[in-house]
Amino acid sequence: MRPIVDLDHTSGSPTSLLRTFVGLHLRDLGGWIRVAALLDLLATAGVSNSSTRSAVSRLKGKGLLIPDKREAVAGYRLDSAAVSGLERGDRRIFTYRGQRDDEPWCLVSYSLPEVDRSKRVQLRRTLMGLGFGAVTDGLWIAPGHLRAEVEDALVGLDVRDRATIFITQTPLTAEPFAQAAAKWWQLDTLAARHTEFLRRYEHAAPLSENSAPLPENSAPKSSLEPREAFVLWLHCVDEWKAIPYVDPGLPPSALPSDWPGMRSVELFAQLRRTQAEPARAHVREISSAES
């Protein structure tokens, strides 16, 4: 199972921005882009040509991009094997799924011997990347709606026979459940990520204290030119994309009263509605221009 998002990525780095660009735009372009257009677009976002070429080399090595010359024009195409991973990423990044207090939990218990230490490390990273919290070394917990994803992950890592999945109601903890959840998911660290996202991007789509998400069928317009919207949206998604993997959408009973997550989820949705389409239009324009 190919990783969708590198949880250790440094947002804003050339490689991270290129990965974000590929995920946002390359499928919309038919899976291929001219080298010159790619360099131009990433330069607009603040990435030098040399840095973009180095980042492309890394993604070629990971099997994401493939050199492909068309009618004597040098370009890169998306590896077809990467499409399913990008689609899974779309679902996690752009579709927020919050758990209600009356919904079940998914627990995963596993036991791997020392001889399988590398696989054990990989499994832990995978569980973290799915939004599971660590109750103990071999017991992890997440909202019940992640059951199918973790089942696929266990099969993909060839450890399904070493793990047991439990679907249960709220665990009975000795301390208040919210205190236990804060430790299992390291909520202080996660809250800091949400707060930083708000700090960086709330100026682009200010939210009032009582604001509500706009209806899905509404069509708010960006106040930015398409070129500016492209830069804003690329950096915004690059900053945001890892958060939904470590924040599984915990219910109110598991969160502190001042939890910033819902405001940042709302902000990201607002930015998507205002910036995504003009950003897409800019990419299409540059990509279709003559070399």
What is each of the regions a protein language model found here?
Residues 29-41:
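Short acidic, hydrophobic short linear motifs in intrinsically disordered regions
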Residues 63:
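Glycine-centered, phosphate/nucleic-acid-interacting loop/turn motifs that mediate DNA/RNA or nucleotide
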Residues 69-75:
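Short, Lys/Arg-rich nucleic-acid/phosphate-binding segment
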Residues 114-207:
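Mid-protein regulatory/catalytic core that forms ligand/cofactor-binding pockets
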Residues 179-291:
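C-terminal regulatory/effector modules of DNA-binding transcriptional regulators
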